[in-house]
């Protein structure tokens, strides 16, 4: 397989890609993935011994409960009780990291009662994706192997392996039918080759207008992508301000997400970027979302000359010089784990409190005296939660305690990963262990799933960033309960719609059997 034959979205080397399998073909369809899944931007670690234990327990417990409820294992695992079963299994292996009651797993009504507790919670997903209808690059099919119904109607059955899984119908199903997401921010990515753009700036705004018109409420907001150093890039900024009116900007300081780019740049480049900040602030579009972290194992070689642009060494000065500008750092700048043993990362944190690149971000507010830098959790919450929940709690806890609970925002990087519901449930249930709190001298716990801290992370922080009236959120959520998307969801569930539990992307081969049950 040559590099040109590798699927789009894969920045791993040919050898590294050959060490992977498509997740939905080989991975056990658990409500929570039982090994790290990668979207192709970073190397998935092999399934750890603890993850194998979790998988064994989920199967064992699910078989028992499914039989008792006269269901198949797959049917049971698609229920709220099945989700609870997965968290119980994780707690048995990792210690009590997630708040879950055994009654949820055994009693469908008890699981339903817990689900009702979260009805109406405002959840704003700060990072979501789909592709344009005329996208022709079939290489994108390598990013996932999805074979569930792509329409709102769950009876549509299996669909061919085509790009339709990445398009709006499936996006609406995964984001709004199969999860508790209330509002989604639609994003995109620039590429040196314009043929690879997933969505143009016009397509992003057209999609948002279409969905909001159909819903009868504001369910989607959109980015405009900026491309510093491209010829005449500021002309597109002017057009976006005048015609498109996005809620925020999006870009990659590394230039191209999947390889060395001639357009890498820095946030603190005074000549290049400061005129843009001035223009953005004047237009009232004063939030920019920047991809940081999330690099492949061989990033120093694969992104030679540009990888340092994926760190946060350009954030502090820019934020200090432009206090009216908000800088949302995607993936919380976390450098993916490079070792095959994830406990090595936790061991480093236990030793010195440092998490690669993410801690550098968390220290910026105090170091530079700024309050306009935010950490977003897309992809990195998912990968750490399923690989080492204790590390995940430390990672999120450090962001919350060093940056403040007002400066951490929820994002999932869906639809690449399928439905974000398991991520939402993991965040609702996650807590920082007391020994970590004491050793680090932290004061802020994550708290209840509908408590102050998690409500801020899930949606209220983004509501402020994107100029949604926080005081009207409660009333808006009530309207969301009765808009067209809510009606579609009610019909979908009434017809038997359920999560597929399909994990998308890539997993490490590590000798496992192909399995889908």
Locations of regions flagged by a protein language model:
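Active-site gating/metal-coordination segments in enzymes
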Residues: 190-310
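Hydrophobic faces of well-ordered beta-strands that scaffold small-molecule active sites
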Residues: 124-128, 184-186, 220-224, 249-250, ...
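Catalytic pocket-lining loop regions of alpha/beta-barrel enzymes
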Residues: 140, 258, 263-410, 418, ...
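Active-site gating loops and adjacent loop-to-helix segments of metal-dependent hydrolytic enzymes
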Residues: 46, 53, 132-166, 260, ...
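Mid-to-C-terminal alpha-helical segments outside catalytic/metal-binding sites
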Residues: 71-88, 111-113, 138, 152-174, ...
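N-terminal secretory signal peptides
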Residues: 1-71
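N-terminal twin-arginine translocation
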Residues: 63-78, 86-111
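Divalent metal-dependent hydrolysis catalytic cores, especially in the metallo-beta-lactamase
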Residues: 126, 145-164, 173-196, 219-225, ...
């Amino acid at each position: 397989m040559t590099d040109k034959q590798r699927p789009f979205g894969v920045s791993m080397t040919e050898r590294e890609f050959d060490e992977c399998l498509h997740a939905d073909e080989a991975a056990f369809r658990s409500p929570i993935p039982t090994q790290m899944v990668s979207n192709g931007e970073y190397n998935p670690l092999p399934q750890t011994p603890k993850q194998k234990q979790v998988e064994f327990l989920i199967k064992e417990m699910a078989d028992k409960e499914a039989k008792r409820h006269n269901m198949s294992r797959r049917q049971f695992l698609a229920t709220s009780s099945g989700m609870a079963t997965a968290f119980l299994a994780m707690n048995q292996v990792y210690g009590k990291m997630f708040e879950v009651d055994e009654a949820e797993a055994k009693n469908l009504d008890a699981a339903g009662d817990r689900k009702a507790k979260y009805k109406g919670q405002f959840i704003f997903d700060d990072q979501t994706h789909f592709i344009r209808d005329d996208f022709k690059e079939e290489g994108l099919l390598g990013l996932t192997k999805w074979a569930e119904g792509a329409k709102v109607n769950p009876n549509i059955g299996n669909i061919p392996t085509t790009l339709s899984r990445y398009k709006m119908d499936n996006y609406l199903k995964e984001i709004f039918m199969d999860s508790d997401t209330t509002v989604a921010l639609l994003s995109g990515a620039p590429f040196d080759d314009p043929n690879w753009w997933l969505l143009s700036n016009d397509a992003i705004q057209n999609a948002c207008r279409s969905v909001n018109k159909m819903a009868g409420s504001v369910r989607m907001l959109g980015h405009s992508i900026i491309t510093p150093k491209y010829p005449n890039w500021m002309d597109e900024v002017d057009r976006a301000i005048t015609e498109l009116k996005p809620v925020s900007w999006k870009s990659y300081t590394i230039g191209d997400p999947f390889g060395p780019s001639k357009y890498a740049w820095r946030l603190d480049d005074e000549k290049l970027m400061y005129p843009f900040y001035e223009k953005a602030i004047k237009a009232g579009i004063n939030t920019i979302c920047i991809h940081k972290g999330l690099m492949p194992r061989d990033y120093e070689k694969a992104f030679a000359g540009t990888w340092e642009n994926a760190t946060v060494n350009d954030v502090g000065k820019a934020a200090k010089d432009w206090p009216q500008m908000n800088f949302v750092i995607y993936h919380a700048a976390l450098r993916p784990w490079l070792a095959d043993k994830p406990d090595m990362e936790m061991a480093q944190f236990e030793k010195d409190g440092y998490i690669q690149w993410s801690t550098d971000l968390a220290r910026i507010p105090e170091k530079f005296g700024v309050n306009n830098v935010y950490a977003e959790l897309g992809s990195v919450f998912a990968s750490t939660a399923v690989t080492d929940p204790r590390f995940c709690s430390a990672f999120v806890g450090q962001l919350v305690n060093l940056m403040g609970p007002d400066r951490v925002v929820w994002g999932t990087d869906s639809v690449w990963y399928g439905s974000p519901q398991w991520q939402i449930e993991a965040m609702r249930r996650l807590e920082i262990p007391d020994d970590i709190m004491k050793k680090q001298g932290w004061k802020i716990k994550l708290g209840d799933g509908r408590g102050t801290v998690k409500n801020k992370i899930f949606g209220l922080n983004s509501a402020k960033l994107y100029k949604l009236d926080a005081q009207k959120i409660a009333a808006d959520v009530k309207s969301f309960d009765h808009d067209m998307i809510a009606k579609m969801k009610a019909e979908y569930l009434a017809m038997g719609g359920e999560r597929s539990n399909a994990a998308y992307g890539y997993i490490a081969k590590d000798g496992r059997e192909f399995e889908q049950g």
